[in-house]
Amino acid sequence: MSRPIGIIDSGIGGLTVASEIMRQLPKEPIVYIGDSARCPYGPRPVEEVRAFTWQMIGRLLHEDVKMIVIACNTATAVVLEEARAQLDIPVVGVIRPGAISAIQVSENRHVAVIGTIGTIASNAYTMALHSIDENVTVESLACPLFVPLVEQGTIKGPEAEAVVRESLAPLQGAGFDTLILGCTHYPLLKPVIEACLPSVTVISSGEETAREVSSLLFYHSMNEQHQAKATHRFYTTGEANQFKQLAASWLNIHTDSVASIHLDGPLPVQATMKSK
């Protein structure tokens, strides 16, 4: 049996990354965990985000995944480097791929980033952007109302438009030509965001993250070559039917393999740690 790629997120937003991986790598099986019961992660203390993320990682390791994608910007900012240091499988985050894409696209070297409170407070995007181009100007804005909006299924219409317009008001007239959606929930609001910022190029990290996953699989000779069609499994700490409906209606991900799970307490991950 082929070893799957593991993907984790604070909820359903990581499906925007999962769908892009499924599109670019159709032979690769995926195991996805979305922690909708404890979403959003953005306002939570760092140690809580760390604990929740490691619980999901532990569950993925019991699924014998060959790679982990942290498809949550808040969790990427908190856990990515320590996960890479401690695990013996590749771990991919979503921050640097988004930063690379923004630098490539921006013509005036002026980029804005919107994200959760935790992601913006971490300065992870600013550091990633400056590591690529130290002269790029960066605007950052937390938009804490976006994730709850998406999780409740309000991605268009008057309510979504009003929340997005009010949240983005501080960025109006700032002079940037490129906007990074620094949360994997936000691409589901992309049409509404683009309507508020019509002259700005909007970047989501899913496509670039999928490219990095593909490159790492080939580099480590882990890419699936024989399977005709991949089988995917999805887990949520929330309500399985709601997850299934949102995945189908928003991202055209149709699956009967959605199960509700409970994550509580640290899971034994030591067996997969790198030997000292």
Swiss-Prot record:
Keyword Isomerase: yes
Keywords for the protein's UniProt record, in alphabetical order: Cell shape, Cell wall biogenesis/degradation, Isomerase, Peptidoglycan synthesis
Reactions the enzyme catalyzes: L-glutamate = D-glutamate
Any single Pfam family the record assigns to this protein: Asp_Glu_race
Stored SUPFAM superfamilies: Aspartate/glutamate racemase
Record-linked InterPro entries: Asp/Glu/hydantoin_racemase (IPR015942), Asp/Glu_race (IPR001920), Asp/Glu_racemase_AS_1 (IPR018187), Asp/Glu_racemase_AS_2 (IPR033134), Glu_race (IPR004391)
Positions with a binding annotation for substrate: 9-10, 41-42, 73-74, 184-185
Pathway: Cell wall biogenesis; peptidoglycan biosynthesis
Residue ranges of coiled coil: none
Domain of life from the UniProt record: Bacteria
EC number: 5.1.1.3
Residue numbers annotated as active site: 72, 183
GO terms for MF: glutamate racemase activity
Keyword Cell wall biogenesis/degradation on entry: yes
GO process annotations (BP): cell wall organization; peptidoglycan biosynthetic process; regulation of cell shape
Primary role: Provides the (R)-glutamate required for cell wall biosynthesis.
HAMAP family per record: Glu_racemase
Family classification: Belongs to the aspartate/glutamate racemases family.
NCBIfam families in the record: glut_race, PRK00865.1-3
PANTHER family linked: GLUTAMATE RACEMASE
Name this polypeptide is given: Glutamate racemase
Source organism (scientific name): Shouchella clausii (strain KSM-K16) (Alkalihalobacillus clausii)
